[in-house]
Amino acid sequence: MDVRRWLLVVLCALASLVQADEGPVPGKITLASEEWNDYTNKDGSGLAWDLLRQIFEPAGITLQTRSEPYTRSVGLAQRGEVDGWVGAYRDEASGVLYPHWNFDSDHIYALGLATTPTPSLATLGNYRLAWVRGYKYEEYLPNLRHFNQIERRDGILPMLQHGRADFYIDSLTEARYVLGQAHDPSQFRLTPIAELPLYIGFADTERGRALMAVYDQRMAALVKSGELKPIFGHWKQPYPF
């Protein structure tokens, strides 16, 4: 047999083995997320859902969304009942896979009374803080000592007005949503605190590994081409890359 022909046969056989070992890429991805206003709306609209469609659907993978409380979303991914959850901080939970690329950054803000001294990342630990249970900001923001975790975003403004906390910590989108409930927004102030990369926490399954590989390949190409910029612009959010 001609040497070149023999080498071609060997290479084709090796390629077939590698492809069989990797397994087929699923045609659908199911992602769970808490319902965040204009980010992961229950009807499938919002910045994050639009970004993820642009990442997966041109690769032949249909996005299926599922709205669940944050801690339940994490648990579903850990048990492999969904392919991943949206809005993970790197290494925040065990038993899942984290990709190389983040798809966005969480713009973390402190909401407080306008009369309270303006906080910074360095001074935040001097204040009494509150945030929604499950977000674990104490693991990502330094020197936090006094904080309470609340079950829902109702009643945050009265909590600040009555001095039960100095600042409420959340992403900019959700902090703006809370501030929008104020009769007089001028009584309050939003202060930027930190930028935390946001990831998909993929299920540690064969499907999850295959989908994560597609995600990282697509993100590298999309960031290089700038194709995600118009989506951030449409939702009036800063471009994080």
Descriptions of predicted regions:
Residues 111-129:
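Flexible hinge/capping segments at coil-to-helix
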Residues 136-152, 219-241:
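Ligand-binding clefts/hinges and TM-proximal coupling segments of bilobed small-molecule sensing domains
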Residues 47, 51, 123-125, 171, ...:
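Short amphipathic alpha-helical coupling segments at ligand-binding clamshell hinges
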Residues 8-16:
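Bacterial N-terminal signal peptides
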